[in-house]
Amino acid sequence: MKTDLTHVLDALVDRKAVDPVVLDLRGLSGATDYFVIVSGTSAAHVRGMADHLVTALAPRGLKPHHVEGLAQGRWVLLDYVDFVVHVFHPELREFYQLERLWGDAPVVAAGDDGGSQ
């Protein structure tokens, strides 16, 4: 699983993901093991990161079980069953505060801010 998460983060950071975080939900949620949470800078950026992630993971045999929000580009949810990727527009990430909602979940990875340079 760690290898899959590494590929997820690499693909998102490659597309300038902002504030990437991975939460370990094992023991806290029966729905999934990990949340990967990132932000984009615009709806186009959010859609582009989500599209790139699906394309980048496909050769590894990883395909999302379900995708929500791609057309709008405000909050794209990619459900890979063992992990769920949330790609947010900044305002929605701040509004929903998943990191705070799941505050008991250990942060197992947090990357550099790919969007600042």
Per-range role (PLM):
Residues L78-Y80:
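Active-site beta-strand termini and strand-to-loop segments that position acidic
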Residues M1-T32, G40-V76, F88-R93, L98-Q117:
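Polybasic/polar functional segments that serve as interface/processing modules
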